[in-house]
Amino acid sequence: MKILIVGAGIAGPTLAYWLLRSGHEPTLVERAPALREGGYLVDFWGAGFEVAERMGLVPRLMADGYRVREMREVSNSGKRIAHLNPLRVIDGAAAGRFVSIARSDLARATYDSLDGQVETIFGDTVDEITETEDHAAVRFASGAAREFDL
């Protein structure tokens, strides 16, 4: 099946990865002109970590990530009011399957896992979808038109 996925952040390329391995032809469309940079640091563990393991991404995520040893709350004068060791709290509960990573690094790793096998349309977005019995006719904001099965 030819499948259009809107968004090339984290979820879009992850879905494309699994669809490709299931014999489908995914295409990503992303409004931004390139993969987005920046974003917050996210704590990555649980179900997402398990998916990353299955995709073979964990070594890269651990290398790109951060092992935050202490979080502090400080007063206006800089005096420490409270502190927390997230490795002790979260890492213990996650059995070592935990990393803090920049959102853009996580997105880049998932996108790179596609290894150039998925067409990505940057700088465009879906303007209209018309469903028929056997396909979806998609008109992009750029004026381009394509047909997909889903």
Regions found by a protein language model. Name each.
Residues 33-53:
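Conserved N-terminal glycine-rich FAD pyrophosphate-binding loop of Rossmann-like flavoproteins
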Residues 1-11:
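Beta1/beta-strand and adjacent pyrophosphate-binding region of the FAD-binding site
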Residues 1-3, 49-150:
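Conserved N-terminal helical subregion
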Residues 15-24, 51-54:
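A short, Lys/Arg-enriched amphipathic alpha-helix followed by its capping loop at the start of a domain
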Residues 11, 32, 127:
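Adenine-nucleotide cofactor-binding loop residues
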Residues 13, 17, 107-108:
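Short, hydrophobic alpha-helix immediately C-terminal to the catalytic nucleophile
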Residues 20-40:
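Glycine-rich FAD pyrophosphate-binding loop
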